[in-house]
Amino acid sequence: TLGVEGEIDAKVVKMNYGGGVKLGGGWGSGKTTFLNALSDYIPKDERIITIEDNAELQIKGVSNLVRLEARNANLEGEGAVTIRDLIKSALRMRPDRIIVGEVRGDETVDMISSAMLNGHSGSMSTGHANNPMDMLHRLETMMLMGIELPLIAIQQQIASALDVIIHLGRLRDKSRKVLEITEVLGYENGRIQLQTLYKFQEEGMEDGKIKGTLMKENEITQREKLLAAGYSETGIHGGSG
């Protein structure tokens, strides 16, 4: 498991109803596993479209689910269907949200600019990164691969599209953990502003396994999105919502 059951404030999960979520981490850190777990909180009446290179996502309990898979070119170099092609097609299929297994190139433009900023704000994807700030830098680079815009415009789009970055890692004992959950506050003073909500604190070893806790560091500040997700004012300020 990823060792997070019962440790994450329900407010973070509830933001998944309407917030853009990006999962980051290295190879084998559990990004796809956690994305599957996060998808359990998607309202069951939504229309979901998943897009992958190879089918790995296991979205359960959603009746209106469309799975799209990329395809390599044939021996003649024809017939390829890319992740970017599929995102563009998915946008015409009237989804409530789009879930992309991994973005790694110019398709980031369509995921950020077209999907997350145009009525599909609960969309999610994964990507390789060393920490939340590194994830932002990689997203900037990938968007620059696909569109000619000033960096400031790209940063503003990313800041508007994303609400939460969840960073996962594989520790030296081979366990996989959520290491940090970060809120994207917006664009200000020439940069994307972040706030750490939770951070994994290592507490030692027991029977060869790393023990630790995902410690809460700050409250979510995006009050309007929590209200839109169904939280009451009491819930935002510490109640159960």
Describe each PLM feature range.
Residues N36-K88, M135-L139:
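P-loop NTPase switch/communication element
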Residues G30:
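Conserved glycine(s) of the Walker
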